[in-house]
From Swiss-Prot:
Part of the 30S ribosomal subunit. Contacts protein S5. The interaction surface between S4 and S5 is involved in control of translational fidelity. This is Small ribosomal subunit protein uS4. Residues 97-160 form the S4 RNA-binding domain. Keywords: Ribonucleoprotein, Ribosomal protein, RNA-binding, rRNA-binding. It comes from Xanthomonas campestris pv. campestris (strain ATCC 33913 / DSM 3586 / NCPPB 528 / LMG 568 / P 25). PANTHER family: 30S 40S RIBOSOMAL PROTEIN, SMALL RIBOSOMAL SUBUNIT PROTEIN US4M. The keyword rRNA-binding applies. It comes from the Bacteria. Pfam families: Ribosomal_S4, S4. Signal peptide: none annotated.
């Protein structure tokens, strides 16, 4: 499956936001001007976006934050629209309960791409069973543990240190860094999710 492997700064500038594609310990440097679009004429690209363009940019931003392709993202939207409640909130909750995202939230990896790799390399166990599917949906009460091999990886140990230093662990997960394990306590409410995402724009886009 195709994945973007180019400069993370380029993506961040395209969306005008930090997409959490770099470790908090290596934040986007001063050369990455988020207010300036990438390309030779990026500085000149100003002006008010149309409603459609604004909606499209928000969708692209969220896709890139969670590392999804269009078909995957659209499938999540379709699933969210069939559930009871607010479609936009349902969408974010589905994305947040992906196994790779939960591993990222627990601090087992410094970025979501790194968490996805950890999962695909069979470094993660859910309720004692090895799971290598990044999109696996985690439920409240599920226990996440790293394999013995993953626990010995320096990047995993460093990720946990960074998470503790930057107080990155959200309230809906519980982590025991010494045991390389955690519990997904509950599906997060909208108030607990990123405030810089306007999911209503995505709903408007797909509703057309």
């Amino acid at each position: 499956m195709a994945r973007y492997i180019g400069p993370t700064c380029k993506l961040a500038r395209r969306e005008g936001a930090d997409l959490s594609l770099k470790s908090p310990a290596r934040a986007l440097d001063s050369k990455c001007k988020l207010e300036q679009k990438p390309g030779q004429h990026g500085a000149a690209r100003k002006g008010k976006l149309s409603d459609y363009a604004t909606q499209l940019r928000e969708k692209q931003k969220v896709k890139r934050i969670y590392g999804l392709l269009e078909r995957q993202f659209r499938n999540y939207y379709k699933k969210a629209s069939t559930k009871k409640g607010n479609t936009g909130e349902n969408l974010l909750q589905l994305l947040e309960t992906r196994l790779d995202n939960v591993c990222y939230r627990m601090g087992f990896a410094v970025t979501r791409p790194a968490a996805r790799q950890l999962v695909s390399h069979r470094g993660v166990l859910v309720n004692g069973k090895s799971v290598n599917l990044a999109s696996y949906q985690i439920k409240a009460g599920d226990a996440i543990t790293l394999s013995e091999k993953a626990q010995k990886q320096l990047r995993v140990q460093e990720a946990l240190t960074v998470a503790e230093q930057h107080d990155m662990t959200p309230s809906w997960v519980e982590v025991d860094s010494k045991k390389f394990s955690g519990v997904f306590k509950a599906v997060p409410d909208r108030a607990d999710l990123p405030s810089d995402i306007n999911e209503a724009l995505i709903v408007e886009l797909y509703s057309k």
